[in-house]
């Protein structure tokens, strides 16, 4: 039974495991003041060979946060506003120091330090997978975050397109049916012919 129970998390797990051959740990608890937060996914390949983002960026170890608020914020405008606030709080640092709060939890000091302890190194990337992100904010901020802090952003459209392109090359598609998401993908894309929207 999956730990996460929303569509974007299910798709992200499928993308990490089936598409990239990653081993994942999910819902890793993180102690924060007065409560617990979590890291949605930690991911790496067992042999530590890099896997790639859709733009070709190599990733060896990653912590991943998924956020889907498409009913409330279909264009990602609010996510863009929140990201700008978090980037201002980050300033030149690698994380937002406690006790400051962050809209995107992987930017918090507690999450960064726990991932460093788990991986045994600070040599890891942070990946945010969201339903959408304001294109202006993304163009302005995300290249700098990627270059200076190894923080990357993808949308569900990019994940679906990447999965679709990969699926075309899979020789044993029925082998994907061992997971619910793989079975759904094989049924909807393979049998029913669903395609990503342009």
Where are the regions that the model predicts?
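Intrinsically disordered, low-complexity Ser/Thr/Pro/Gly-rich regulatory segments
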Residues: 1-198
């Amino acid at each position: 039974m999956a730990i996460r129970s929303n569509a974007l998390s299910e798709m992200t797990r499928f993308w990490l495991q089936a598409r990239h051959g990653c081993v994942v740990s999910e819902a890793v608890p993180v102690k924060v003041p007065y409560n617990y937060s979590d890291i949605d996914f930690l991911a790496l390949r067992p042999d530590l060979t890099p896997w790639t983002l859709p733009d070709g960026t190599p990733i060896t170890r990653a912590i991943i946060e998924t956020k889907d608020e498409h009913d409330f914020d279909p264009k990602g405008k609010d996510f863009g506003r929140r990201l700008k606030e978090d980037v201002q709080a980050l300033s030149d640092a690698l994380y937002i120091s406690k006790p400051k709060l962050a809209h995107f939890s992987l930017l918090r000091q507690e999450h960064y330090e726990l991932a460093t302890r788990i991986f045994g190194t600070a040599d890891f990337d942070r990946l945010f997978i969201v339903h959408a992100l304001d294109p202006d904010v993304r163009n302005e901020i995300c290249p700098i975050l990627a270059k200076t802090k190894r923080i990357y952003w993808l949308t569900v459209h990019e994940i679906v397109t990447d999965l679709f392109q990969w699926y075309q090359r899979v020789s044993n598609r029925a082998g994907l049916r061992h997971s619910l998401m793989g079975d759904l993908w094989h049924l909807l894309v393979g049998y029913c012919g669903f395609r990503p929207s342009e």
